[in-house]
Amino acid sequence: MTDLAARDRIIVPLDVPDVEAAITLIDRLPEAQFFKVGLELFVATGSTVLTILKERQKKIFLDLKLHDIPNTMAGACRSAARYGVDLLTIHATAGKPALEAAQAGAIAGAAAAGVQPPTLLAVTVLTSLSQQQLTEELHVPEAVPNYVQHLARQAEACGIGGCVCSPQELVVLKTACSDDFVRVTPGVRPTWAAAGDQQRVMTPQQAIAAGATYLVVGRPITAADDPAAAFQRVCEELTP
């Protein structure tokens, strides 16, 4: 995927409360190709927003971060795959049986609907978590990069197609996982934007150089007075 155009690498999150707000943002970003639908919008609208995106021929990152027992994971991924989404998140810490069940469910659901199966992405360590929180609150003694590497390797061994990780962990994943393993990176902020509430951030250009396949860029675009101009500005940062 190294030949992807800049605009195809940028995923814009629809972090809005309802369909009307989602449509407004989508239509203000005609050049954006990939949109993320997270928990807030999906719980509020169900599949309606997915249908709207498909009608506009946009790609969909369904970011539900599923985490449950294997049978439930299989069923949820089977149902999600029927919508024809491109990326779907599951928690890497759900364990190997759940990861394998999720992959099987996604393949079965897509086949039943006659669509391509989504690439499942294992969520490793949330970018809002610091090393101190991981150690003190979650009692995980591993350093963040080592823990991410372990979770990503395990996910790929279970047939999962990619992972979500912060930019700083991209370097260790270059050797830990195959070249085909998709790396989706939030915690990306252009040089002209503030870091916000994410602890481990990097510029778009730095993240791509470190091995990211896709970048999730939210508030620098969506909160801008002119989202289309901000989107173009991020694209220009990625264009040599």
From Swiss-Prot:
**Where on the tree of life does the source sit, at the highest rank?**
Bacteria
Q: Which residues form the active site?
A: K65
InterPro entries according to UniProt: Aldolase_TIM, OMPdecase, OMPdecase_AS, OMPdecase_bac, OMPdeCOase_dom, RibuloseP-bd_barrel
Q: What pathway is it annotated to?
A: Pyrimidine metabolism; UMP biosynthesis via de novo pathway; UMP from orotate: step 2/2
Q: Which PROSITE patterns match?
A: OMPDECASE (PS00156)
The record's listing under SMART domains reads: OMPdecase
The positions annotated for binding substrate are 15, 36, 63-72, 127, 189, 198, 218-219
The record's listing under SUPFAM superfamilies reads: Ribulose-phoshate binding barrel
Q: Name one GO molecular function term.
A: orotidine-5'-phosphate decarboxylase activity
Q: Name one Pfam family in it.
A: OMPdecase
Write down the chemical reaction(s) this protein catalyses. orotidine 5'-phosphate + H(+) = UMP + CO2
EC number assigned by the record: 4.1.1.23
Q: What GO biological process term is on the record, naming one?
A: 'de novo' pyrimidine nucleobase biosynthetic process
A single Gene Ontology CC annotation of this entry is: cytosol
UniProt KW keywords: Decarboxylase, Lyase, Pyrimidine biosynthesis
Q: What does this protein do?
A: Catalyzes the decarboxylation of orotidine 5'-monophosphate (OMP) to uridine 5'-monophosphate (UMP).
Q: Which family does it belong to?
A: Belongs to the OMP decarboxylase family. Type 1 subfamily.
Note the subunit structure: Homodimer.
Any idea what this protein is called?
Answer: Orotidine 5'-phosphate decarboxylase
Which species?
A: Synechococcus elongatus (strain ATCC 33912 / PCC 7942 / FACHB-805)
